[in-house]
Amino acid sequence: MIGKLNHVGVATPSIEDSWKLYRDVLGVTDITDKRALPEQGVWVSFVNLPNAQIELIEPLGAASPIHGFLAKNPRGGQHHVCFEVPDILAARDDMRAKGATVLGTGEPRIGAHGVPVIFVHPKDMGGVLVELMATPGEAHRP
């Protein structure tokens, strides 16, 4: 059912500080500008690697869901892993049929890549928050 790993989400209190790590320490040169996703309550920036992306996620506003994560992990850290799926609704239904909890209403919403996404609860995924996203077009490939 799942396709390739698309990205690993990393929560951070400062995307700008995280850029320094990826640029200065790891030598990455392809990093997108920071942009707001108000409907999700986050700022995002993508670190583009040859085979995947790192999604840097910073809270946007007081109601951001990332605040809770950073309260427990003040320096930030791995937030989720994201896999591509060819059919987001079939993937959602398959997760539910297998007893996994799809977060929110279960209706896909548009994610940072401009395609529908869902999140599956970590308690059902070995302790890892899993994002499933509709396979994006070539413009969004690392």
Regions found by a protein language model. Name each.
Residues A36-E39, N73, R109-A112:
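A short beta-turn/loop motif at secondary-structure boundaries
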Residues L5-P13, S45-N48, I54-E55, G68-P142:
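Vicinal oxygen chelate
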Residues L5, T12, W19-Y22, V47, ...:
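Short, structured motif recognition centered on aromatic/hydrophobic residues
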Residues I2, V25-V28, R75, A97, ...:
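Alpha-helix termination/capping residues and helix-transition junctions
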Residues M1-Q40:
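Long, hydrophobic N-terminal alpha-helical segment
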Residues D33, A63-G68:
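A short, acidic/glycine-rich surface segment
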